[in-house]
Amino acid sequence: MQNAGSLVVLGSINADHILNLQSFPTPGETVTGNHYQVAFGGKGANQAVAAGRSGANIAFIACTGDDSIGESVRQQLATDNIDITPVSVIKGESTGVALIFVNGEGENVIGIHAGANAALSPALVEAQRERIANASALLMQLESPLESVMAAAKIAHQNKTIVALNPAPARELPDELLALVDIITPNETEAEKLTGIRVENDEDAAKAAQVLHEKGIRTVLITLGSRGVWASVNGEGQRVPGFRVQAVDTIAAGDTFNGALITALLEEKPLPEAIRFAHAAAAIAVTRKGAQPSVPWREEIDAFLDRQR
């Protein structure tokens, strides 16, 4: 593993409260669950953990509450090779929470309270201007306030820091933001939201990628689930297949892919090789339960790839 440029991740931190039960309660009904766990999540934190465990030189800009969960999350992130200096503790606020019910068929219903995530303001981003300006890449998602994502993208763009955006959860985005993005990684749903093109095959993916190229984005990677990734650089596209594994839990597959992908690109791996590295990380993650507990370490990814040769 060669020395690589530095990465800044900006995003969300949640505590996931997960209750498994046979069937969802109807209004007014109380249902007994069969398994409960608290796991750390949030798209930003998941991607930061994936990058840290993949070997990136990474700092994380985020917010937690001044509660015990926030303290536990910060301690855990520090053990994942992440510089948590830019993680702000918001007085009087709770750490972000996701309440997740999972039924016997594996379906889920989720309610989220942003908590301290909503306090990740443009002012807090501005306080990290030098860190963003000096980084090789900035990786963001859409669980943070959009004005803060925009502020960080502007700083990065002005200083030739690569801007990578995972546009999740799916939403429409202003062209002003998209014009600042160098690498975008939507799934099919997110690509349709951004382009108006339903992505059902490689031809659709190529059309959607072209729309995003026309908005100023050089590298478009549309994730296609088990079919892999449609990778398009300035209109030159190809599908890079993933690995076949027996999936147990796909909760953090996309986040693992994104964190590992940017790590590999910062090591100057060619794009197809970086995607293959990210596919390997995600393939390992889906064979394990939970969000961050499923994210593999670099040694595991390298060993997985060695077995595929």
UniProtKB/Swiss-Prot annotation:
Origin: domain of life: Bacteria
Location(s), subcellular: Cytoplasm
Protein's pathway: Carbohydrate metabolism; D-ribose degradation; D-ribose 5-phosphate from beta-D-ribopyranose: step 2/2
Cofactor binding notes: Requires a divalent cation, most likely magnesium in vivo, as an electrophilic catalyst to aid phosphoryl group transfer. It is the chelate of the metal and the nucleotide that is the actual substrate. Also active with manganase.
InterPro entries: Carboh/pur_kinase_PfkB_CS (IPR002173), PfkB_dom (IPR011611), Ribo/fructo_kinase (IPR002139), Ribokinase (IPR011877), Ribokinase-like (IPR029056)
Gene Ontology terms, MF aspect: ATP binding; metal ion binding; protein homodimerization activity; ribokinase activity
Cofactor: Mg(2+); Mn(2+)
Role of this protein: Catalyzes the phosphorylation of ribose at O-5 in a reaction requiring ATP and magnesium. The resulting D-ribose-5-phosphate can then be used either for sythesis of nucleotides, histidine, and tryptophan, or as a component of the pentose phosphate pathway.
Protein name, per record: Ribokinase
Organism encoding this protein: Escherichia coli (strain K12)
Taxonomic lineage: Bacteria, Pseudomonadati, Pseudomonadota, Gammaproteobacteria, Enterobacterales
